[in-house]
């Protein structure tokens, strides 16, 4: 999951999707925070610890679940700088992701930008969700970003977030 800005709601949607999938009892879900850099990594989710991705993928020992069937991991640490630390580790761990015990792995990735690590990670994802903030994201930026993602990976969907209805509620069936 990614977006074009920090305020598009990507982390909220990623956490919500992971939580919803974990409640179906159809498998284990790993939510991975890929937002690298000081102050951007969230070591806790609802008071539960997030583990380094390498530890979450280890077969040797169990990690604590944040909720039933929901586990949390980060690629970097709060002390690490932008992308340099985590991405090398991520690519080293790729074989372990496929062999892990998790049925769903959701990546909360940094916003797309000229130097965003998300461009490099997107080809490895089974599905990309591109979050578009309805009132602030420029149409041309969306078209260019979507086209570039489609060239890298065919399975990209757009989620239109924070949409507002300005018409009467009875028109949209809200009353």
Question: Residue ranges of each PLM-predicted region?
Answer:
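Structural beta-sheet core signal
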Residues: 31, 72, 107, 130, ...
């Amino acid at each position: 999951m990614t977006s074009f800005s920090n305020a598009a709601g990507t982390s909220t949607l990623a956490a919500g999707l992971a939580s919803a999938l974990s409640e179906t009892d159809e498998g284990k879900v790993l939510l991975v925070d890929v937002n690298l850099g000081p102050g951007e990594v969230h070591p806790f989710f609802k008071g539960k610890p997030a583990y380094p991705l390498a530890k979450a993928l280890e077969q040797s020992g169990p990690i604590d679940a944040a909720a039933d069937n929901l586990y949390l991991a980060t690629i970097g640490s709060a002390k690490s700088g932008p992308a340099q630390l985590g991405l090398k580790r991520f690519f080293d761990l790729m074989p372990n992701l496929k062999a892990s015990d998790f049925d769903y792995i959701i990546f909360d990735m940094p916003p797309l930008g000229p130097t965003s690590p998300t461009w490099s990670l997107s080809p490895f994802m089974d599905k990309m969700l591109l979050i578009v903030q309805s009132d602030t994201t420029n149409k041309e930026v969306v078209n260019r970003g979507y086209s570039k993602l489609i060239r890298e990976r065919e399975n990209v969907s757009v989620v239109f977030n924070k949409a507002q209805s300005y018409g009467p509620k009875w028109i949209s069936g809200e009353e």
